[in-house]
């Protein structure tokens, strides 16, 4: 299975995305796609979409991990502004950071998305692909 990087939730057919997102309105293609297409969650505001899609050998969407590359914490509900300078004092870069969250929304819910009865290796493959991005 090879991961594919998506610049927008709208890069996948809605039926494919929704099959994995189920009934969670905040990770729905409609919600994320609208935020991305209107610029509310776009690069100019520090929310660069980098969603990972994983297809099986037959080309069917098997896993999905909504991700955003963040250059700052403006618009986040968790303020980590004290962490960034501390991390930099330790000689490391805190930004950019890759987050699997919903822009401007502190909603709980699954983020490693796989179809019902999916192979247990799919979440691990998504995590490995995300680690490769950073």
Task: Describe each PLM feature range.
Residues 1-134:
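N-acyltransferase acceptor-side catalytic subdomain
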């Amino acid at each position: 299975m090879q991961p594919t990087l998506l610049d927008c939730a709208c890069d996948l057919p809605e039926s494919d995305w929704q099959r994995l997102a189920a009934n969670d309105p905040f990770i729905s293609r409609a919600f994320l796609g609208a935020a991305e297409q209107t610029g509310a969650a776009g690069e100019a505001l520090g929310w660069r979409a980098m969603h990972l899609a994983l297809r099986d050998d037959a080309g069917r969407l098997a896993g999905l991990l909504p991700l955003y590359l963040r250059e700052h914490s403006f618009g986040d509900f968790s303020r980590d502004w004290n962490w960034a300078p501390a991390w930099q004092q330790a000689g490391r870069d805190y930004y950019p950071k890759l987050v699997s969250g919903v822009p401007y929304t502190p909603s709980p819910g699954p983020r490693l998305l796989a179809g019902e009865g999916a192979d247990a290796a799919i979440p691990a493959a998504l995590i490995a692909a995300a680690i490769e991005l950073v």
